[in-house]
């Protein structure tokens, strides 16, 4: 099974082949390969901390079991879960236009696309200075028709509330365009997004956040009059891009389209999947812990049965492998018996050795004879050389005689035609020589320019390599003294590239290692840190929620105390007024005043008692919270210990199996 993520958009949206995801999500090809990849720590990864084992286990289990929900209108619970930080992009699609527009560094996509060719990549100047050009044929009628069909079908499928007319997607008004754009953005980013007074500013900000590749073609003028002939093709392409994003978001969790191994149950993974045992244990622990935490059950028969079935499948595969090895052992035993029955191969080799030694002696004698023949041939060659020298002397004499004759011929008069022909040939040869000199000069200049380009590229690569080493030291990739448990143990993150090497295969090997090993390890490390940070964030949110509840309770108690104090003041005022009015009245009135003062005293005592009881309740709640947190930590430690015991038992079982196989292999070798 291919566990690479497949396309997220169905093919039924447009008749013309379009990218399954927006072009902004496609990683642009790097001219220098993986060396141009941004390795700077992101805003989340830079805050490195030592996390507890229990938290990391819980985060890993939730990371594997959590799913990304669809965003079809009417399912707000699924949309809220999709907008959470459980997604790989950190929930950037859930930000409203009034929130921070900056996408975190962990989401920015670096250029890691390598060239299709395996040879040396081109280092011609001007590659990085060219602006991005939209490859889509925006003015093509067929492309526009496909875009309109795609947008119209999607709006109908998601029940767009406003009516769609024939002119809605050909020359819409500003109000219609704004309505469609807001509907798509609310469906993609945030259903409760608040819009400002200026639609154009919000639109540009949202498109920048979504990394729309054709930002150069979107302006405030075009957004003000989207139905204009010069503006509508760009606006239509932008709406089609948003529709593709919405489709990708709807199909984010469709098992028929994607095949993410983290979203596939561990029981359905192939037996050769790496770390299948760990994955089974993580899924089992996550499932049972969530059930236990919710108080649904104390025994997990269904989960244990699934785990038993998975281990039975693994055991059956191991038994089949053992049977295969046993058949191989029997086959080898039969071969050994056949070798014992046949003639010993050593005797055959000895006879062959005697024959070879005899051939060797004959060959040596043959070489001696050939040496004698060589000496005779050398004598003959020396005699021939002497004859050649004499012939050369005679040839020189003949040549001097020929030169004397040519001088005599030159002294004679030549015709004008012959002179003109000779001059013409000399001029043509001179021009040819000058052209050759110019070509040589141009070739030398071109070679010098290419050498300067290569030198600059090498200097730039050295700078990038220095930055990589510095950042790697900061996050502990190259410092062995730092204990970073999330790093792969068998991955060497050190890059030692000799650009001056004569063999290009060495440089290519380093590049292949960077793409296949280091990049994958860095991606795994980033995902681990992201899961850990997500777990800490969820825990912090829960604690803050509990703290807010306690604060609200305290505020309510304070309000009650304030009301009692107001009532007390009112009663005091009434008592003072009564004293001024009935100062001259009889003793019965004094008794009434005394009774009122007694009631006021009782109310004051009751209010003070209420304050004291509220404070004691707050202190008891804090103590209970601390005890609950302590119990939670103890339970997490016990869960970690139990998981460790299970892992130790599995490791021992593996070691026992390996030792058994070794004993069988040793027995086979002895036989």
UniProtKB/Swiss-Prot annotation:
Region (Disordered), start-end ranges: 1-132
Main location: nucleus
InterPro entries recorded: Kinetochore_Ndc80, Ndc80_CH, Ndc80_sf
Subcellular localization: Nucleus; Chromosome, Centromere, Kinetochore
Residue stretches of biased makeup (Polar residues): 39-60, 108-121
Family note: Belongs to the NDC80/HEC1 family.
Record's protein name: Probable kinetochore protein NDC80
């Amino acid at each position: 099974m291919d566990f690479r993520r497949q396309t997220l958009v169905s093919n039924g949206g447009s008749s013309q082949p379009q990218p399954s995801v927006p072009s902004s999500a496609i990683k642009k090809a790097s001219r220098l390969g993986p060396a141009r990849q941004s390795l700077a720590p992101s805003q989340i990864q830079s805050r490195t901390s030592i996390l507890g084992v229990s938290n990391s286990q819980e985060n890993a289990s939730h990371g594997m079991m959590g799913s990304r929900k669809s965003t079809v209108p009417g399912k707000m619970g699924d949309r809220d879960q999709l907008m959470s930080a459980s997604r790989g992009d950190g929930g950037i699609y859930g930000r409203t236009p009034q929130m921070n527009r900056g996408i975190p560094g962990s989401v920015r996509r670096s250029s890691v696309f390598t060239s299709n060719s395996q040879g040396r990549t081109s280092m011609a100047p001007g590659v990085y200075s060219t602006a991005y050009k939209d490859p889509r044929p925006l003015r093509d009628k067929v492309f526009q028709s496909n875009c309109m069909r795609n947008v119209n079908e999607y709006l109908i499928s998601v029940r767009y509330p406003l009516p769609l007319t024939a002119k809605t997607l050909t020359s819409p008004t500003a109000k219609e365009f704004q309505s469609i754009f807001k509907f798509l953005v609310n469906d993609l980013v945030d259903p409760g997004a608040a819009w400002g007074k200026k639609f154009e500013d919000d639109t540009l900000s949202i498109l920048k956040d979504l990394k729309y590749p054709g930002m150069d073609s979107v302006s405030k003028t075009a957004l003000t009059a989207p139905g204009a002939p010069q503006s509508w093709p760009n606006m239509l392409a932008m709406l089609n891009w948003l529709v593709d994003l919405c489709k990708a978001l709807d199909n984010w969790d469709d098992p028929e389209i994607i095949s993410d191994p983290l979203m596939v149950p561990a029981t359905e993974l192939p037996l050769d999947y790496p770390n299948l045992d760990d994955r089974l244990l993580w899924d089992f622990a996550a499932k049972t812990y969530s059930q236990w935490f919710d108080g649904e059950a104390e025994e997990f028969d269904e989960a244990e049965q699934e785990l038993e079935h998975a281990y039975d499948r693994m055991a059956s595969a191991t038994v089949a492998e053992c049977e295969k090895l046993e058949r191989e052992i029997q086959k080898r035993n039969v071969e050994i018996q056949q070798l014992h029955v046949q003639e010993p191969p050593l005797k055959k080799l000895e006879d062959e050795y005697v024959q070879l030694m005899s051939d060797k002696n004959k060959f040596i004698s043959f070489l001696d004879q050939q040496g004698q023949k060589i000496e005779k041939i050398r004598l003959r060659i020396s005699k021939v050389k002497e004859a050649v020298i004499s012939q050369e002397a005679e040839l020189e004499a003949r040549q001097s005689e020929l030169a004397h004759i040519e001088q005599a011929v030159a002294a004679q008069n030549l015709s004008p035609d012959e002179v003109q022909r000779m001059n013409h040939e000399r001029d043509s040869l001179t021009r040819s020589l000058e052209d050759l000199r110019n070509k040589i000069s141009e070739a030398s200049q071109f070679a010098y320019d290419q050498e300067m380009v290569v030198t600059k590229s090498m200097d730039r690569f050295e700078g990038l390599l220095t930055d990589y080493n510095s950042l790697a030291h900061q996050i502990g990739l190259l410092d062995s003294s730092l204990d970073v448990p999330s790093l792969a143990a068998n991955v060497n993150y050190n890059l030692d590239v000799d650009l001056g090497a004569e063999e290009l295969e060495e440089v290519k090997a380093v590049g292949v290692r960077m793409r296949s090993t280091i990049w994958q390890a860095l991606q795994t490390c980033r995902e681990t840190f992201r899961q850990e940070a997500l777990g800490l964030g969820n825990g912090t949110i829960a604690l803050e929620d509990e703290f807010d509840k306690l604060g609200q309770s305290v505020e309510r108690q304070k309000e009650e105390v304030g009301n009692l104090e107001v009532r007390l003041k009112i009663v005091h005022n009434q008592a003072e007024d009564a004293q001024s009015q009935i100062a001259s009245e009889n003793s019965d009135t004094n008794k009434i005043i005394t009774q009122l003062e007694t009631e006021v005293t009782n109310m004051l005592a009751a209010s003070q008692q209420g304050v004291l009881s509220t404070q004691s309740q707050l202190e008891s709640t804090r103590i209970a919270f601390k005890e609950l947190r302590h119990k939670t930590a103890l339970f997490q430690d016990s869960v970690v210990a139990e998981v460790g015991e299970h892992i130790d038992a599995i490791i021992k079982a593996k070691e026992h199996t390996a030792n058994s196989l070794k004993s069988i292999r040793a027995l086979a070798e002895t036989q």
